């Protein structure tokens, strides 16, 4: 029952943002993160990164999020990834955002690409936004999402256990006080 609800909510959110997808959505997302002061320096210092052009998130009591991405190592596209999230707690609404996870070194890259990787509920995320944003962690506690990378303000930007995660909101409205984490899969490029 919960799985059906989560899938339905995520499907609705993904349909809402389907029009945002472009042929070069990965390049556009990477460009947005390179243009944002908070994340730009990580392109020069990281071993690699995983970029998710659109992650759709929604919930009514039970929530979920899903997005497809690509993984890069030393500037080369090396594989594909997906991110999923299931959350429990008070939540209502839907939102879409772009996400990037930087790998500080080869060890962090190997940890992420070794199979199914998870960020716990307390993992921090830096929100790059032109609008007000209360706080963003995978544990929830967000208020509204709007705007984009223009004139961005951020809250801290450093590696945590070899990884640094940033999101740029695309749109939507999500009220939540939830417990959740993100799970990533990785498939090497053929």
Question: Each PLM stretch: what is its role?
Answer:
Residues 23-190:
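Small-residue-enriched, tightly packed secondary-structure blocks
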């Amino acid at each position: 029952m919960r799985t059906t609800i989560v899938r339905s909510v995520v499907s609705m959110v993904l349909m809402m943002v389907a029009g945002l997808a472009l042929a070069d959505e990965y390049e556009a997302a990477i460009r947005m993160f390179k243009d944002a002061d908070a994340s730009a320096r990580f392109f020069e210092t990281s071993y690699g990164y995983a970029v998710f052009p659109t992650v759709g998130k929604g919930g009514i009591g039970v929530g979920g999020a899903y997005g497809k991405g690509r993984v890069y190592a030393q500037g080369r596209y090396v594989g594909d990834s997906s991110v999923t999230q299931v959350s429990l707690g008070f939540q209502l609404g839907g939102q879409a955002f772009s996400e990037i996870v930087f790998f500080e070194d080869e060890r962090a890259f190997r940890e992420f690409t070794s199979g199914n990787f998870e960020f716990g509920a307390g993992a921090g995320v830096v929100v790059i936004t032109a609008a007000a944003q209360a706080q963003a962690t995978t544990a929830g506690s967000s208020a509204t999402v709007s705007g984009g990378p223009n004139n961005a303000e951020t809250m801290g930007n450093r590696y945590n256990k070899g990884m640094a995660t940033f999101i740029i909101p695309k749109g939507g409205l999500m009220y939540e006080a939830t417990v959740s984490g993100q799970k990533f899969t990785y498939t090497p490029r053929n």
